[in-house]
From Swiss-Prot:
Parts of the chain on the Extracellular side: 18-180
GO molecular function: phosphatidylethanolamine binding; phosphatidylserine binding; signaling receptor activity; transmembrane signaling receptor activity
Pfam family, one: V-set
Protein name (Swiss-Prot/TrEMBL): CMRF35-like molecule 8
Natural source organism: Homo sapiens
PROSITE patterns, A to Z: IG_LIKE
Signal peptide: 1-17
Top-level taxon of origin: Eukaryota
SS bond list: C36-C103
Length: 299
């Protein structure tokens, strides 16, 4: 899984093409020199002295520019193309100078995929307090020179491949240890994003409500009119169902007899004599009262 990362690290100059670790030592306040060999094809290239890289690139302390020497504080470097080696000198040693260093050749990217380097372990031991002042002075001015035999590029590449496997394991451990932190940061970012979205939504709703209130305040009369209650009487018209026309009902007929008012009665004393029958026969017969009929219909 991490093989592409290991290959990428092999392409970075100054990383992971190491020879076997060499150890040099010097007293506190003294100095020491380290002689680092290189191949013939690296004669014109720049050489450097650096701390091992923490991530990708190593932290170069001092580097040559051509054949001229270079100094950076208490550390100096000088190239000797005739001897196919360069020398690094550390002066006025302190306990903080102890540790692992690399002396390497800065190869161009297109010529080589890795820098051939030699790992050097520097140890600093305290100066003996039982020495005489003359001995202490001699210790301070003493110089320890360590020369390493040349190491071929093939050996460097093989050792670098072995070391890259260990670097790969260390990288996996670092990533695994930092994975919970990355997941926590991702969860925090998601929570912040959700919170920002909710806040923006609430502000948008408030803005819409504020716009509605401003429109009502601009038209107070219209707002008052709209707020009043209006009542109206609604009369519902009942429309008959569209059914077949009902047959007309029979007309009820009522009959009544209307008689003219009778004349008032008159009483008289009548004396019948022999001529009565004749008079009665001669007297005209009274007509019967007329009867009027009318038809009253109930609608």
């Amino acid at each position: 899984m991490w093989l592409p990362w290991a290959l990428l690290l092999l392409w970075v100059p100054g990383c992971f093409a190491l020879s076997k670790c060499r150890t040099v030592a010097g007293p506190v306040g003294g100095s020491l020199s380290v002689q680092c060999p290189y191949e013939k094809e690296h004669r014109t290239l720049n050489k450097y002295w650096c701390r091992p890289p923490q991530i990708f690139l190593c932290d170069k302390i001092v580097e040559t520019k051509g054949s001229a020497g270079k100094r950076n504080g208490r550390v100096s470097i000088r190239d000797s193309p005739a001897n196919l080696s360069f020398t690094v000198t550390l002066e006025n040693l302190t306990e903080e100078d102890a540790g692992t260093y690399w002396c390497g050749v800065d190869t161009p990217w297109l010529r080589d995929f890795h820098d051939p380097v030699v790992e050097v372990e520097v140890s600093v031991f305290p100066a003996s307090t039982s020495m005489t002042p003359a001995s202490i002075t001699a210790a301070k001015t003493s110089t320890i020179t360590t020369a390493f035999p040349p190491v071929s590029s093939t050996t460097l590449f093989a050792v670098g491949a072995t070391h890259s496997a260990s670097i790969q394991e260390e990288t996996e451990e670092v990533v695994n240890s930092q994975l919970p932190l990355l997941l926590s940061l991702l969860a925090l970012l998601l929570l912040l994003l959700v919170g920002a979205s909710l806040l923006a939504w609430r502000m948008f709703q408030k803005w819409i409500k504020a716009g509605d209130h401003s429109e009502l305040s601009q038209n107070p009369k219209q707002a008052a009119t709209q707020s009043e209650l209006h009542y109206a009487n609604l009369e519902l018209l009942m429309w008959p169902l569209q059914e077949k026309p009902a047959p007309p009902r029979e007309v009820e007929v009522e009959y009544s007899t209307v008689a003219s008012p009778r004349e008032e009665l008159h009483y008289a004393s009548v004396v019948f004599d022999s001529n009565t029958n004749r008079i009665a026969a001669q007297r005209p017969r009274e007509e019967e009262p007329d009867s009027d009929y009318s038809v009253i219909r109930k609608t």
